């Protein structure tokens, strides 16, 4: 229901039981190895594409959903949903890339980091 108009139904949701939860977990586990084998560049491309979609063609949709679901004004929704979500996606790609860089180290020292999704 809408937080500002309690009689207005925004959506109806199905509540799955234990079997549905187990199926969802199994589906996630079955794709874990594939995601782990995906290169950083490809993962980054996926997240940056999502950011571009949120900042572009889906901007009005995400803002409208935020306005309805959280009783935000158009200005609040723009800041809290479209802009911030796209920024988070882009920032996290940038930050993940920085994790692969070598930190400042003494001569002859090399640091390695293995990230496991």
Could you tell me what each predicted segment is?
Residues 1-5:
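Glycine-rich phosphate/pyrophosphate-binding loop
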């Amino acid at each position: 229901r809408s937080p500002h108009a309690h009689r207005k139904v925004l959506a109806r949701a199905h509540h799955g039981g234990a079997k549905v939860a187990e199926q969802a977990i199994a589906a996630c586990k079955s794709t874990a190895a594939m995601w782990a084998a995906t290169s950083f560049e490809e993962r980054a491309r996926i997240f940056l594409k999502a950011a571009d979609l949120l900042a572009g063609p889906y901007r009005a949709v995400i803002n409208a959903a935020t306005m309805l679901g959280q009783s935000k004004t158009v200005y609040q929704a723009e800041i809290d949903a479209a802009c911030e979500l796209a920024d988070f996606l882009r920032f996290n790609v940038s930050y993940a890339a920085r994790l692969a860089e070598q930190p400042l180290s003494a001569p002859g020292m090399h640091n390695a980091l293995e990230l496991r999704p």
